[in-house]
């Protein structure tokens, strides 16, 4: 069936990535189990056929559990210890602070109960030291931030979620580092010093081609990391990871997404370290 073919293809992709990580002593964040985007439309329909109606909530729950079980079991049995965290649910909240009702997951369930189910199944099948995150973008904007806080708090209080994944797709003007700091402090209130906070998809969009102009990007990176280091060292906020959304500017998703060449990362398309790289190192000292 279409479903079993997809599982097989996914295993092939997973195997390549997990082997690369394992061979090189690298750890992976798993991204992402439940998302409105890039989940095939047929996954939500009867007989996996888009011409048929959406399945019932009970059938959807069974499919979700089967899928999460398969993915986590495959990773853990074949490459134990490589995946240290999962973004269990990605982008469940709208910018205005409401839940994303346009998601097929929401449509089938009729409510946001799919979020709790996803975390319940992830907790059930994940090894005990694997951390589970709710991940989202514009996570520093007040209305959205406050809803993410509430969703994560409810999950965390049930023992289902370990932390907040802050995607951290920034531009040169937005957000301010102060706004990011306020969001981190807000999320920390869920369980001060214990709840994990990670920046999961960090990049800073800009179109500055020259090394001289790139210095302003480096300055923003340095301000950000100074704040993160201070939050962790001096305020004892449990910031446990920063993941950049790509290695070099040449591989960044942003150029395609923005329709203009972006230079958002720590290394240039030529793999040379940029001033932003040294700025991050300086902040870590």
Protein language model features and the residues they cover:
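An active-site-proximal structural segment forming one wall of the substrate-binding cleft
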Residues: 17-24, 49-88, 112-121, 150-156, ...
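Active-site-proximal loop/turn and secondary-structure-junction residues that shape catalytic pockets
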Residues: 34-36, 90-94, 136-140, 168-172, ...
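Distinct, well-ordered alpha-helical segments
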Residues: 98-101, 118, 141-157, 176-184
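Aromatic- and acidic-residue-enriched carbohydrate-binding clefts of CAZyme catalytic domains
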Residues: 41-57, 96-105
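Aromatic-rich peripheral "rim/lid" segments of glycoside hydrolase catalytic domains that contact
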Residues: 12, 74-77, 81, 87-112, ...
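Short, small-residue-biased leader/transition segments that mark boundaries at the very start
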Residues: 1-7
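Aromatic-lined carbohydrate-binding surfaces of glycoside hydrolases
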Residues: 4, 28-47, 90-96
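Hydrophobic faces of well-ordered beta-strands that scaffold small-molecule active sites
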Residues: 28-32, 84-88, 132-134, 162-166, ...
């Amino acid at each position: 069936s279409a479903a079993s073919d997809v599982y097989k293809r996914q295993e092939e992709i997973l195997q390549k990535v997990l082997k690369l990580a394992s061979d090189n002593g690298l750890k992976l964040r798993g991204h992402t189990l439940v998302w409105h985007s890039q989940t095939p439309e047929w996954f939500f329909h009867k007989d996996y056929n888009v011409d048929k109606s959406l399945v019932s909530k009970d059938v959807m729950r069974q499919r979700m559990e089967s899928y999460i079980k398969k993915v986590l079991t495959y990773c853990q049995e074949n490459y134990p210890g490589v995946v240290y965290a999962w973004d269990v649910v990605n982008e469940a909240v709208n910018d205005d602070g409401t839940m994303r009702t346009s998601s097929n997951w929401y449509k089938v369930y009729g409510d946001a109960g799919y979020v709790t189910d996803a975390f319940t199944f992830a907790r059930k099948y994940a090894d005990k030291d694997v951390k589970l995150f709710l991940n989202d973008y514009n996570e520093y904007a007040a209305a959205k931030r406050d809803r993410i806080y509430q969703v994560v708090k409810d999950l965390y209080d049930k023992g289902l979620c370990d932390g907040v994944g802050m995607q951290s797709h920034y531009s040169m003007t937005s957000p301010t580092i102060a706004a990011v700091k306020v969001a981190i402090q807000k999320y920390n209130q869920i369980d001060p010093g214990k709840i994990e906070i990670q920046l999961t998809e960090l990049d800073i969009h800009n179109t500055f081609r020259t090394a001289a102009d790139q210095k302003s990007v480096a300055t923003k990176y340095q301000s950000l990391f100074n704040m993160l280091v201070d939050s962790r060292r001096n305020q004892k906020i449990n910031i446990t990871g920063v993941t950049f959304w790509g290695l070099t500017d040449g591989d960044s998703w942003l150029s395609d997404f923005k329709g203009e060449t972006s230079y958002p990362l720590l290394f240039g398309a030529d793999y040379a370290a940029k001033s932003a790289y040294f700025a991050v190192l300086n902040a870590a000292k």
